[in-house]
Amino acid sequence: MKRFGLALVGTLLVAALAIPALGIGSGDGRKVLDFKTLAGVTAPYTGANPIRGLTGGGLPWEIADANGSVRADGRVKVEVEGLVLARRAPVPTNLQGTNPIPRFGAIVSCLTTVGGAATTANLATSTAPASSAGDAELDTTVNLPSPCFAPIVFVTTPGGAWLAVSGL
């Protein structure tokens, strides 16, 4: 009876350690990144000085509010309010404070490894409608690499130029 009890305890201990480990990297719903702010592209990054290989939009942008998340299963949620062309030069006066782009997308950028070498993976989402006031909601998925180190989320044009990035 004592042996049975020890065997049962041992089996339960192994199961308790092994079952959570099976979920690591298996596409579970854990948050990889959770953000409450995005920063609009500014003059030094409009066209020149790409971040992780991604070029900023051609003019400065500003954003009123944002939040979003990336989960281990690849689900990407981004909500932006007031993502518009900056209200200052060099943006033409008639475009300041407006969004001329009808759809926004997102790119999740991870540092990862391929064949033992460090590399960057930029994963584009589908696009979603954006209002002229710069409001949009994306709820989509990407195939995250494993590992996915130092994730960054960019809000982009349909062509992939970024307008806002996770950060301040």
Segments predicted by a language model, with ranges:
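Bacterial N-terminal signal peptides that target proteins for export
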Residues: 1-9
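Bacterial N-terminal signal peptides
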Residues: 9-20
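N-terminal segment immediately downstream of the Sec signal-peptide cleavage site
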Residues: 23-72, 167-168
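Short, surface-exposed binding/anchoring microloops in extracellular/periplasmic proteins
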Residues: 51-100
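Hydrophobic residues positioned within well-ordered beta-strands of beta-sheet architectures
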Residues: 78, 104-106, 138-140
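A mature extracytoplasmic/lumenal domain signature
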Residues: 82-84, 110-112, 127
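Extended low-complexity, serine/threonine- and proline-enriched intrinsically disordered segments
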Residues: 91-115
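Helix-rich interaction surfaces within compact, conserved domain-sized segments
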Residues: 114-168
